[in-house]
Amino acid sequence: MLAVAILAAGKGTRMKSCLPKVLQPLAGSTLVERVLTSCSGLQPQRRLLIVGHQAQEVQQQLTDWQGLEFVVQQPQNGTGHAVQQVLPVLEGFDGELLVLNGDVPLLRPSTIEHLVNEHRSSGADVTLLTARLADPTGYGRVFSDQQGRVSSIVEHRDCSDEQRHNNLTNAGIYCFNWKKLAAVLPQLCSDNDQGELYLTDTVALLPIAMHVEVADPDEVNGINDRCQLANCEALLQERLRNYWMKEGVTFTDPASCTLSEDCQFGRDVVIEPQTHLRGCCNIGDGCQLGPGSLIENAELGHGVSVLHSVVCDAKVGNEVAIGPFSHLRPGAGIADQCRIGNFVEIKKSQIGEGSKVNHLSYIGDAQLGRHVNVGAGTITANYDGVRKHLTVVGDNSKTGANSVLVAPIVLGSDVTVGAGSTLTKDVPNGALALGRSKQLIKNGWQ
């Protein structure tokens, strides 16, 4: 049996933020949710989140995580004190306890699984994750024999000059035999510079301590301030881009683009500079995104181009051209082979197959049929000051430039709207609609 305890009680004062540190965003998710996701594949029997500072906010953020148990640490008196709070919660539990940190979000699931498997196969009381750092200054050094058995952990300030040449460091991630740990946790003391109880001290109290070295030291990067947050964001973004490039996606300027882990791409997608994908995005084969575009929680079919545009909570069919400077807002649905052009905004509207909204238009709360041509400057006046109303335009209809369709209104199929018209009444199939004043010329005006 396996229980997981995630340490998430710290104040994170160096963040200088109103937001709890573990709720800081990283590539579209929070730090602590990334840690929770990384260990989900182990299917632990118990998942404990140790909270303290702004505990209520952390709990509210994680209400959708079924089976997650919250353990409150008050006051926050070190990592050992945090795990002591688990003692009554896991009374009678017989298995392993995996201890993770809520501010170490880059751990791969495979690394965690390897740590747990090695711990189980070795029969150790504790197995700690270690990392070899190019610059280990400030980190505790781990000393072990060739079989990986840990003899001691020495804090940097206590190391001799010779010991400081050892670059094997403690990553602060452990897998314990829970019963053995529970027996020694009460023995921890706060006889140190910080006056806190350190979980590290349990290693010296347990007879058999082993270690597993992480292959990529970047996985155990902790986050304490905005600089480290930015560094982890860059590392995670590079990891995501490299994965998708190996899957057939082209980034013409990778470092200028960002993704979320919930993005999915078909083959031969080209992502141009300064293009950002957030949330859950599903991008079909052969799409060209950017430059300078934002796509969020959107579904794009095959062969879609998005140039200098924003697509948010929208669904787009195949072979659609969007932009430049278009804005597809929530509820926009664009069918196959449409053209959404310069400075066009579409909100909560369905645009039928082959239709074109090419220039300077606002289409809101509307249903456009197939092969509709919307003239430059056409506006659906959907709001009466109290409620939004629907505009319906039938197949093969077209509006002239600078037309206003005052909703609620229905235009039938094959309707033509004269340029400059303001329409307030329904138009039958095949009709010409004109709603403008007669041109008046007064000669000799000046």
Curated annotation (Swiss-Prot):
Q: Where does Mg(2+) bind?
A: D103, N224
Listed GO biological process terms = cell morphogenesis; cell wall organization; lipid A biosynthetic process; peptidoglycan biosynthetic process; regulation of cell shape; UDP-N-acetylglucosamine biosynthetic process
Reaction(s) catalysed (UniProt annotation):
alpha-D-glucosamine 1-phosphate + acetyl-CoA = N-acetyl-alpha-D-glucosamine 1-phosphate + CoA + H(+); N-acetyl-alpha-D-glucosamine 1-phosphate + UTP + H(+) = UDP-N-acetyl-alpha-D-glucosamine + diphosphate
Going by the record, the broad EC class of this enzyme is transferase
GO molecular function term, any single one: glucosamine-1-phosphate N-acetyltransferase activity
Q: Please name the InterPro entries in this protein's record.
A: Bifunctional_GlmU (IPR005882), GlmU-like (IPR050065), GlmU_C_LbH (IPR038009), Hexapep (IPR001451), MobA-like_NTP_Trfase (IPR025877), Nucleotide-diphossugar_trans (IPR029044), Trimer_LpxA-like_sf (IPR011004)
Q: Which residues bind acetyl-CoA?
A: A376, N382, Y383, A419, R436
Q: Where in the cell is it found?
A: Cytoplasm
Q: Outline the subunit composition.
A: Homotrimer.
Note the HAMAP family from the entry: GlmU
Similarity field: In the N-terminal section; belongs to the N-acetylglucosamine-1-phosphate uridyltransferase family.
Q: What is this protein called?
A: Bifunctional protein GlmU
The opening ranks of the lineage are: Bacteria, Bacillati, Cyanobacteriota, Cyanophyceae, Synechococcales
